[in-house]
Amino acid sequence: MSLKTHHTPIFTALALVALGSLDGALASSGGGSLPWESPLQQIQQSITGPVAGFIALAAVAIAGAMLIFGGELNDFARRLCYVALVGGVLLGATQIVALFGATGASIGELHSQVDPFGYSPSPKLIERGEGAHG
């Protein structure tokens, strides 16, 4: 038996142990957020914030005034006004929805119900709509 074949199982076992011990170290090195999340969150806050409301209001007012008082507009200018009008409405859509009091989607509410015998609480889904009454 040569020295090369004698040490191969030992090196294989050591390599497997080393790879198994690296798994936790490699998994725990992540910061939890991806590098593009921060710029996307800033863009989202800019689009849905108060600045977007003012931009949407100005775009709707200017495009509407151009369509009403613009007189004879060529096809390109009219389409540009329509694009500005639709963009203003889309940017102001969150403010329009918030105007009616809607804050977000709520499909079902989970409430915790405590058992009278002192067992741990279990979540209970409150059903609403047609299927709620049987």
Curated annotation (Swiss-Prot):
A Pfam cross-reference name: TrbC
Q: Which domain of life is it from?
A: Bacteria
Q: Does the keyword Acyltransferase apply?
A: no
Recorded hits in InterPro entries, A to Z, give: TrbC/VirB2
| Major subcellular location class | membrane
Query: Per UniProt, which keywords does this protein have?
Result: Cell membrane, Conjugation, Membrane, Plasmid, Transmembrane, Transmembrane helix
Q: Mark the transmembrane ranges.
A: 10-30, 51-71, 80-100
Q: Does the keyword Transmembrane helix apply?
A: yes
Q: Where in the cell is it found?
A: Cell membrane
GO terms under cellular component: plasma membrane
The membrane topology of this protein is:
Multi-pass membrane protein
Q: Please report which protein family the annotation says this sequence is part of.
A: Belongs to the TrbC family.
Q: What's the protein here called?
A: Conjugal transfer protein TrbC
